[in-house]
């Protein structure tokens, strides 16, 4: 009887403790809710949700595999395999850090992966998640052991809007300074991506990846045009029966960079906005599968040349824009971007302009006569 009583007491304590943590992790506010770590399609995830939209953060690899309206299953970031389990993977929107593209031969032999380590490691969930009047906030971090760097990510979903902001602080933990790059790698996929899906951006001067040194930026073109290896001019707003040129990069000239994909048939618009001082390059790629659009990358970052560091150092800049950054020993730098959704009419013609006006994001339609303007509340998360 004594043993049974003690066991019952211990069980009661355990249940009370677990219940307290569950309540802390799922505390509901009138502004929205922060859900405890949960399994989404069999993977460890954080889910941030307000009354408009749902945002999923994958812990093993740090990807953002899902951002959609609550009343719809249509997820623009439906790209990459969300295999059940805890192995890191690259899905939807993932981070390339400390590089974009391949390592050098020597770095590869030492284990440095393509696009760096940030999507190849398990991220840590930091224990200061909170809900405020501004929105639902979460933090996660990753250590990059080969690079000797760390990333601390802060994510805030607006209180009642399909709009979220990500700020990432990159720290150089090495005893010496080093060069590095950071590129955001969002990729859209079907069914949102199809033939009538339109991509617009304010990227300007551009070139196709794969050109030979010392002038890989030749031939030059202007968005939304590009030139294939055969010298054919193509328009890149819509994806048709070709995936050439496969990867292209464009300099952002304005203070605010943006890239938006819209599908009137599906009634959905999805996009990003960022400061040029953080990310001066817009990098685009696309891929067909069975003759149909399969993937479109709306990438933006600190570089526009998809090469190892020795090549970047030799080239240094393209179109007057540097191809890498330097971070001194023990120092850090913070970069941010915002992502948004909007419902659109079936005859929406694409986007000509994105601006921030106070606490509103204004998206102007790409038509000459009477363009419509979409307004998205930012909650003051970006200015």
For each of these PLM feature ranges, what is it?
Residues 1, 7, 31, 35-36, ...:
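Intrinsically disordered, low-complexity regulatory regions of eukaryotic regulatory proteins
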Residues 10, 25, 331-332:
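N-terminal leader/targeting segments
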Residues 35-165, 173-383:
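Surface-exposed acidic/polar loop and edge beta-strand patches at domain peripheries
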Residues 12-13, 27, 33-35:
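Detector for intrinsically disordered, low-structure N-terminal pre-sequences
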Residues 1-17:
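N-terminal secretory signal peptides that target proteins for export/translocation
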Residues 18-30:
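Bacterial N-terminal signal peptides
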